[in-house]
Amino acid sequence: MTPKFKNFKHDNSGQVETYLFEVISKYTMLEIKTKFGKLCIAKVKLASESIERALNLCNDNCQIVSAKCHEEVIFATILAIKAFSSGRNTAKTIKGEILLRLAGVKQIKDAIKIIGARKGENLIIYFGVSDPCSSLKDFISSLGLREEPLKPCDEDEVKRGFERAAIIEAL
């Protein structure tokens, strides 16, 4: 498969930054190479009885969210990692920062209500490890889950998600 290249633009106080990364499909997972390291994302269906176990097994390099669009999760993760690397984070952890940016709010408890893991389709993203897709595959396997296909995101939904993730910079 030929790699696809995407640009995410983020307006931060009048400056436009472009994140160029390569997206490589592995099964239904996506591995994303960024200047902040590799990320890997997959979609799974969680039963209500497996949510707590999944959250407990999800370490500091993993986040599970109920977002509809994988592109907004990727963007929020990149912004969260960047915020931590520059000392502009609001949350105490990258996982928390991802939640805040996806939900577009400043309180973790509110973000969990809006975008936290729940019964049904969820996205799991791994970051901060040398082979995030291998870690993600092992995580999914350990829970006895099956990957679901990642479908293209609606363009308007992507824009709204990017705006929510970026608005945290201005708050």
UniProtKB/Swiss-Prot annotation:
Pfam families for the chain: CGI-121
Swiss-Prot/TrEMBL keywords: Cytoplasm, tRNA processing
GO CC term, one of those recorded: cytoplasm
SUPFAM superfamilies: PF0523-like
Principal cellular location given in the protein's record: cytoplasm
Any coiled-coil regions, as ranges: none
InterPro entries found in the cross-reference section: CGI121/TPRKB, CGI121/TPRKB_sf
Family of the protein in this entry: Belongs to the CGI121/TPRKB family.
Role of this protein: Component of the KEOPS complex that is required for the formation of a threonylcarbamoyl group on adenosine at position 37 (t(6)A37) in tRNAs that read codons beginning with adenine. The complex is probably involved in the transfer of the threonylcarbamoyl moiety of threonylcarbamoyl-AMP (TC-AMP) to the N6 group of A37. Cgi121 acts as an allosteric effector that regulates the t(6)A activity of the complex. Cgi121 is not required for tRNA modification.
UniProt-recorded name of the protein: KEOPS complex subunit Cgi121
Native species: Pyrococcus abyssi (strain GE5 / Orsay)
